[in-house]
């Protein structure tokens, strides 16, 4: 019998959630995703030193201002790692906009344009890139404009149904609802443990998937942020699942039977009228878990972006 990972690949598009090129070569995913934390982690791999040197050398040619050089080097490093990863995945690379821009629609759009330009200068067409944005109201509005320009987006840090609905209504290409971080919050809040079937993160992704399929939304659902293989197996059939190297290895070494859990609705019904900003903000605010986890996620990505920039600044000196 095929291993668990191979069985999953027959039901769901598997994406590698890593900046580690060796892991991508090993597990042969369709797509790859990174974020500021993963770029920081990747930058500490000795083999990546040339990419950092290349990014810094390039940044020095773009500006004499140190702050601008640091920003440019960070963008160039993320894109350079993305370009390398795209040599080993047939599909798309998700590269994230600076989390510190999560509440600024125009600056998010500007950063997306810059990242796409850097990819194009490296010979990568925008059709192979997904721009990752936090699922704030501003991020969703930025994505709506980018999608209308033909730049596809991946809306991340998604913890609530309100965020998922707003993303679909904005015509976003793909959403990344977080599973494990939802589980973390509920375990801490309630003090209880959950099975894969009762996992609040699994239930959230299932609800989003069913809503999208029922109402004919084309937005791709990509479950993310997993704590264990049970969560992953319980979402077999989801459009895509993005999985870190440790769990990919565990799945590859398992022979557990995989059964399709998520299936598209046989009949579709008309979607409700799009949410207003006020409706979105109210519905989102009603979900204490989502409010906590979105804020925490943005803060933590910003912290890791800052750590990366400290490292780049030291090398620029």
From Swiss-Prot:
Q: Does the keyword Endoplasmic reticulum apply?
A: no
Molecular function as annotated in GO: transaldolase activity
Q: Which GO BP terms sit in this record?
A: carbohydrate metabolic process; pentose-phosphate shunt
Reaction catalysed by this chain?
Answer: D-sedoheptulose 7-phosphate + D-glyceraldehyde 3-phosphate = D-erythrose 4-phosphate + beta-D-fructose 6-phosphate
Query: Where's it found, cell-wise?
Result: Cytoplasm
Query: Which PROSITE patterns does the protein's record reference?
Result: TRANSALDOLASE_1, TRANSALDOLASE_2
Q: Active site: which residues?
A: 132 (schiff-base intermediate with substrate)
InterPro entries registered for this protein in UniProt: Aldolase_TIM, TAL/FSA, Transaldolase_1, Transaldolase_AS
Q: What is its main location?
A: cytoplasm
Q: Which GO terms describe its cellular component?
A: cytosol
Q: Which UniProt keywords apply?
A: Cytoplasm, Pentose shunt, Schiff base, Transferase
Q: Give the enzyme's EC designation.
A: 2.2.1.2
The broad enzyme category this protein falls into is transferase
Q: Describe the protein's quaternary organization and the partners it interacts with.
A: Homodimer.
| Protein name in UniProt | Transaldolase
Q: Which organism is it from?
A: Shewanella denitrificans (strain OS217 / ATCC BAA-1090 / DSM 15013)
* Gene symbol of the encoding locus: tal
